[in-house]
Amino acid sequence: MYVAALTQLFWLNFSAIDTYIEENLHISAFSTGLLALVFPLTYVLLSLPAGMIIDKKGFKYSIGIGAIFTGVFSMIRIIDPHSYPLLLISQIGISLGQPFILNGITKLVVTWFPQKEEATAVGLGSLALFIGMVVSLGVTPSLVDSLGLKSMLLIYGIMGIAGTLLFFLLVRAKPPTPARESKEEEKISLREGLKSILRIRDFVILGFVALIGIGVFNGLATWLEKILNELHGISMVDAGTISSVLVFSGMLGCVIIPLVSDRIRRRKPFLILASSVGAICVVVLMLGSGFAANMVNGIVLGFFLLSALPIMLTMSIEITGERYAGISVAYLQLLGNGAAVAIVPLMEVLHGVRGEHTLPLAFIAVLLVIAIIMAIRIKETAKAA
């Protein structure tokens, strides 16, 4: 969980201080956004190969690869914090490890947890991701203000190396007693795996929901500080507070919603609810004003929208089966991050049309309405206990 949190910490740490980075490194808004955008871009390229490695070698082998990239490149950033090319190369290096870590969560779950606890376990794994986001969005601005950019990168670099060492020292590949009935592992090729999962109607539809949900979240995470500042006059520090509270609320959602889902053996209603509440909250983000109103809106948005991630990952296992746990999650993440590669810069383009963020927010609200329609078409995946 700690290593997974680090990937999100490093993904968003520059987005939390994008105004500072633009002014001190003398670069454009797009160049600053690129420091975060390389993560979904790399995910698109490596997600499926990472998924196949997970299914063939197991979660420890895969996450170990990711932990090495994360630790090493987080330290390289310290060499020259004011060199944009070095920061970009380091971000690319860290992003290379992300698919191997995040796609391994569901494989870890099916290895260590019984089926009746799947959604809860995936929710706890997702919780780690949001802890990383909270620290990145909430703590980074304060660290830079008080200690400077280099000290912030040094602290995060030490955390990265510590994560790598702790993973290899403490994590075991399998539990002493299997959590569920063991099945003979059959090696599958990438092509065979994709053909198998893409024959399943509900999984294809779930892929479109993931495409929109993950893409929209990436867009909001990248530009929220600027949206709050330009639309509502909220300062960088206050915007960071709202962003971190939004993600913290999502952390609670990732624990509570999967617990309820496991208890009542239902997934589909929560997937529909996430997109529905998300669309409403994006409209409120366009029209609402003031710190308090946006804080409350952020709490509601985070709780429901972010809780969709563990629900989607659990549904992917239930639809495709344990055999394809790695590649099915890899495919969903590929679609979602592929959408992010398009949505993040497109939001900036739409912002340029009228010089404000109303148009890009309207765009993602429409996308969430489409996600609602798609989610309704999926059959319930949870089996009665």
Regions found by a protein language model. Give the residues of each.
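Helix-to-loop junctions at the C-terminal end of transmembrane segments
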Residues: 46-58, 254-266, 351-352
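Juxtamembrane intracellular "pre-TM" segments in multi-pass secondary transporters
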Residues: 174-206
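Extracytoplasmic gate region of multi-pass secondary transporters
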Residues: 14-15, 201-254
